[in-house]
Amino acid sequence: MVNDVFIQGFTAALIAGLITGVGGFMIFLKKKYSREYINVMLNIAAGIMLAASFFSLLSPSLEGILRFVPDRHVAGYWFVGALFSGVVLVWLLNALLPHEHNSAGHHGPNISLRSCWLFIIAISIHKLPEGLAVGVAYSGDELYNPLSLVVGIALQNIPEGLTVAISLVGAGYSRLKAALYASCTGLVQPIGALIGISIMEMNEKIVPIGMALAGGTLLFVIINEILPETYNTKKSQKSAAAVFLGFAVMAYLSIVLE
């Protein structure tokens, strides 16, 4: 029988995933978006996810581990081990489903269809651990705050949806098809949520470990996938300010939604 945790976690991840479509349909608002504009939006999204990782996953994870493992040294080993396990998980996903980074190309008018779809696969791959994080967060008790995490992921999905739509238009798709395909990339997140909940339902002691693992996956995605593609070294202050703005907004929301 499906319990409330499955329903809530799946629904939350589905809503956050569908928000990707908001970004996708933004392709109709302007004839052309500059690369700088998209990069600033993605830098803000990276800051949002950094804050969501710390405030909604890593911090409560450490508190949860300390409840079950009083020895702080041992708790630290568990926490760091789970964190790096999340990194390994994403690395394995990337290795099993190879893709290429495609920052410059997805703004051009004549990108190759192969490059376009490899870029979309990359976006979809990293939405799986985001959904996993939502599922893990909903599996916890009152110590955890899944709402702020869901809001953070939803906000991040908007510029990503727009980026995918721009990539598809550049490959020759109509704006409507581009927006619809961009929306579909978010549907990976509820699948990840169901996986996360299923694993966490086995034992409540696994939940804080799972939170740290999920935090590791998100941090690696941000550091390895998003920032290298969008951080402008020629305008580093603007890029840094955008990341900090996103972090500050999410930090505020984490406090308000607590």
Question: In which residue ranges do the predicted regions lie?
Answer:
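Intrinsically disordered, metal-sensing/regulatory segments
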Residues: M1-E258
